[in-house]
């Protein structure tokens, strides 16, 4: 009888582990023998559908093995038990390496994914050939301060007292709270900080095709993710510049940002350029927070040049 219980316990444990693994949505593009690229999306609350639907296959056609995935509890990786911590994300990323039998990869880390990619690389430098920060967060409080300072200036010029009061309210919120982060980004969005100034025909077509595609229809957003992240993760408002300075001794570091990505100050961009060095830093004009859509051709050409 004891033996039967042990067998049942083993089966149930195996099923639980497999269920947890299967909650992670991932997909590969291209030939597995080609240099690997893993894309880490933004968030918390995001997904990789925009990159997957517009750029993943095109990069694969250039001779790369491109892997996209949605973090646990975000997008298509539905998991009600997700904690949304960095360590959980790092553990799942390690599992992705095992699933696709990858020893080393080039990581494209976008927005909040820049923090995940940086912390993963810090813990696993032997698994990373290059870390490509793409519109990536790296000094969160500086970003929040910049958003509030510049939008306040805009509203002062417009004499918009209602929004000036709103900014003052945001400034009084706890800096390590989901509400503070959310309201900073909401006011940035209201001021078009995430939009390219002069959309090109190519960029418009990419977005239109994406919206009509299965990827656009699966643009799932977990509105609880930011709250749970701030509840469970102590490192919820960090500056990774010191980490990046150490990392460049171990892995190749690159950074690509939109000239009109207005959530970053000029000081922040200069700081990043100093860390990765000028030859590994790219600013794209008429481009905001999504370089792989706003200026896709230049984005792909830059990636090719860096990791050829």
Regions found by a protein language model. Name each.
Residues 44-55:
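The serine-hydrolase catalytic nucleophile loop
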Residues 49, 71-86, 142:
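Glycine-rich "HGGG/HGxG" loop immediately N-terminal to the catalytic nucleophile
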Residues 60-76:
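Conserved alpha/beta-hydrolase
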Residues 88-105:
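Conserved acidic catalytic loop of the alpha/beta-hydrolase fold
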Residues 104-146:
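Conserved hydrolase catalytic core segment
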Residues 133-176:
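Flexible "cap/lid" loop of the alpha/beta hydrolase fold
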Residues 249, 255-257:
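Short beta-strand/loop motif that positions the catalytic acidic residue
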Residues 287-296:
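Catalytic histidine-centered segment of alpha/beta-hydrolase-like enzymes
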């Amino acid at each position: 009888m004891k033996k039967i219980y042990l067998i049942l316990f083993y089966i149930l444990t195996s099923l639980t582990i497999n269920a947890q693994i299967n909650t992670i949505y991932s997909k590969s593009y291209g030939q597995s023998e080609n240099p690997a690229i893993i894309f880490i999306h933004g968030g918390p609350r995001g997904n990789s559908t925009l990159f997957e639907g517009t750029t993943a296959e095109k990069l694969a056609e250039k001779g790369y093995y491109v892997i996209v995935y949605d973090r646990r509890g975000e997008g298509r990786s539905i998991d009600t038990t997700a904690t949304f911590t960095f360590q959980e994300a790092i553990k799942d990323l390690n599992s992705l390496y095992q699933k696709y039998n990858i020893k080393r990869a080039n990581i494209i880390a976008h927005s909040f994914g820049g923090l995940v990619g940086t912390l993963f690389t810090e813990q696993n430098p032997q698994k990373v050939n290059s870390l490509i920060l793409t519109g990536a967060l790296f000094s969160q409080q500086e970003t929040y301060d910049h958003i509030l300072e510049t939008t306040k200036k805009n509203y002062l010029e417009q004499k918009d007292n209602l929004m000036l009061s709103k900014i003052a309210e945001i400034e009084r919120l706890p800096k390590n709270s989901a509400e503070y982060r959310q309201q900073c980004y909401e006011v940035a969005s209201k001021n078009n900080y995430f939009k390219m100034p002069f959309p090109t025909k190519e960029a418009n077509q990419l977005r239109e095709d994406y919206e009509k595609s299965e990827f656009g229809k699966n643009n799932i957003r977990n509105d609880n993710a930011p709250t749970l992240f701030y509840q469970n993760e102590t490192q919820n408002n960090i500056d990774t510049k010191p980490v990046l300075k150490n990392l460049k001794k171990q892995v190749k570091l690159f950074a690509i940002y939109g000239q009109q990505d207005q959530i970053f100050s000029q000081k922040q961009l200069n700081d990043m350029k100093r860390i990765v060095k000028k030859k590994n830093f790219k600013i794209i004009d008429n481009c905001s927070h999504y370089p792989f859509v706003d200026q896709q051709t230049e984005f792909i050409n830059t990636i090719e040049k860096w990791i050829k």
